[in-house]
Amino acid sequence: MNDFKKVSESLETALRNEFDFRFATEVSLKEISRWRIGGPAAVFAEPSSINEICALLAFMKNRPEPVVVVGGTSNILFDSDGFGGLVIKLGENFSNFIIEGSRIRAQAGASVPQLVRAVATEGLEGIVHAGGIPGTVGGLVVMNGGTQRRGIGEHVTKVLVTDAEGSIRELNANELQFTYRNSVLKNSETTVLEVELLLKPGNAGELLAELETILDQRSQKFPEDLPNCGSTFLSDPAMYSIVGPPGKAIEDAGLKGLRRGSAEISMQHANFIVNHGDASDDDILWLISAVRKEVYSRTGFVMDCEVLYLSYSGDFRPAHEVADEQWPDIDLVRN
């Protein structure tokens, strides 16, 4: 019996002895990955309540195996070797939201596109710009995601989170420390459970028309026919003012179409890396490192990733850090 199978069976047995809900073993992370990349998770669970999530986290604190909580996976690159612990997925049981006047309470697993359309239909303005962003509300809040130089944090009033030990607490907007594409939640051991937003009254017809325009523009501008994680690199305001957004910098460096294995810098939009079929995590990481080095050599700006890399052992950090460690000597400088 190989080590992975031993880990999987040992952890599953321990979990089943403690909990009475369903666990699955050796579940392919490729099937839940927006990039369609990833090996098997030793054990996989989709809890049905906040209490179950907290209980699982508390239990895993005393186990040697790693644990991670994921939502829509739009900003995650999974290790092609898999994950040697417990993956907790915020699925359909955490996808609800309630609109009460101008205030919205959304579970972390709620779909961003569905939420945006619902609030626009109700005539509430403020987050239509995020209508085409794939993924879930929890992930959007962690990254302070958005478009048009805006972020969801502008409208967040409070967030319910749990720490790595399963203890719940509420954070207000000031405590969340939102900055451009960042928050105190990023790179922390907290998991977002619920989010409260406060929007402003607007015109439903105008908001829905704006949403359709945004979606139409995205469909023309961004690759939708191949698996991808959305924007790979963060837009740096300083770089933006001189060079432009990451996609332009990558395109100007002549890197559109650069390929390794089945992974490619999209010909449609250079800030997207697409999977043509059987790309590996190494393929993606190699492209990330190559792009960073080439753009830096031409512009003097270092582009960081929006994407986080989840290793087999549970290391969870920005993909560019892993990429540069694995591929320190790439030299693609072109005339």
Swiss-Prot record:
GO cellular component: a single term: cytosol
Keyword Chaperone part of the UniProt annotation: no
Annotated PROSITE patterns: FAD_PCMH (PS51387)
Recorded coiled-coil stretches: none
Domain FAD-binding PCMH-type: 36-202
Keywords assigned: Cell cycle, Cell division, Cell shape, Cell wall biogenesis/degradation, Cytoplasm, FAD, Flavoprotein, NADP, Oxidoreductase, Peptidoglycan synthesis
Catalyzed chemical reaction(s): UDP-N-acetyl-alpha-D-muramate + NADP(+) = UDP-N-acetyl-3-O-(1-carboxyvinyl)-alpha-D-glucosamine + NADPH + H(+)
Catalytic residues as annotated in Swiss-Prot or TrEMBL: R181, S231 (proton donor), E306
Annotated function: Cell wall formation.
Family label: Belongs to the MurB family.
Record protein name field: UDP-N-acetylenolpyruvoylglucosamine reductase 1
